[in-house]
Amino acid sequence: MVLATTEQIAGYEIIETLGIVLGNTVHSKHLGKDIAAAFKTLAGGEIRSYTELLTEARNIAIQRMIAEAEKLGADAIVGIKFGSSSVMQSAAEVLAYGTAVKIKKI
């Protein structure tokens, strides 16, 4: 599966647009790690536990988006974008979405 944030893929022609595909997940951190993160905000710097949380969530969202595209018979997903939102305290949703397409090498 070819993934692109652009609308076109160099060296390929889009021969069919199959529709929008998306993948999302909601993740939360363990209470103990959340308390440690709260103290980290006082000192400043990267909160690694949250960085890891969002990286894991983004990867899951991407895999779910790819699974949707594969069900449609897509070769690629173009125009990929990401969104995130706080669902509740200490829980974040990550959304990956794009357009599933069939492509042909030029």
UniProtKB/Swiss-Prot annotation:
Cited Gene3D superfamilies: Hypothetical protein apc22750. Chain B
Species name: Pseudothermotoga lettingae (strain ATCC BAA-301 / DSM 14385 / NBRC 107922 / TMO)
Family matches, as InterPro entries: UPF0145_dom_sf, UPF0145_YbjQ-like
Pfam families: YbjQ_1
Family designation: Belongs to the UPF0145 family.
Name of this chain's protein: UPF0145 protein Tlet_1264
